Amino acid sequence: KTTPYALDFVTDRDGVFDDVLQETMLTAFKAGEHKVRAQVSSLVPKGLNKAKIEKIGNVDIEKGGATWLLPRVKDDACFLNVLKQMSTRLADLGYSVSTGQLVWNRFKSQLRTTKGKNSYPLVWAESITSAGFRFSADRKNHVPYIDITPQQGFLVTKSECVLVQRTTSKEQDRRILAAILPQGFIDETGGVVVENHINIVYSNGLFSAVRPDVIDMLLNSHVVDRAFRCISGSVAVSAYELNSIPLPSLEQVMEIQSLIDAGVHRRIIERTIAGFYGVMIA
């Protein structure tokens, strides 16, 4: 039995491994169980044989298979203390996460450039933008439609939900890029097919008080993006990680919903969400 003792994040992704961009963390374990807080540092490569080590802080590592919350910068130390007190997750708000059902290269014969009788819009990750949902299939190998047989109804999404890109990098301004798939677009087209590089955050029917636009606002907030960066260690934005993000309490989420209903400016709502995480923003 061992316990994490030290964790070093390698700041560079380029040049660590040949011909690949790979985020790397070096972890040292100590035999046995101990109560010493693990030391987290960043390791900045300085050529082939040298590196600068910058201490970030000491943290308690979650036990029992729970998600590790690790600071990426010094300012995250206090932030993590708040995160660890936040017990609400997407499931507590009545939402589940699944991966887009369509692996496109398994259905090549059904892809269409024009809409036919049995066609549905095929939603790619490029349709999720910082300005919201914008149906698009402009990138290489992307087409806008797919024919669906009567036996493939499971591929079709017919209810409003929040779509999240499954692949982003730490260099991007936002690791979580989400957009509402509007019910109006679904009703107009009869449904859509969501490609596999997208996560679908949908109401599971167990609790319906929180609307999708509120979940969208939360996931796109700067402070939730910061929390996600303390969880994620790769370019993948997995369903497991989305389900692990600490979120405000139900009462606080309903307060956010009330602010949206009142037409309050997004900047004020961002400030309110940040406050729930103990973060002050201008």
Predicted ranges, named:
Residues K1-S96:
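Signature of N6-adenine DNA methyltransferases within the class I
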Residues D76-S258, A262, R266-I281:
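Polybasic, glycine- and aromatic-enriched phosphate-binding surface used to engage nucleic acids
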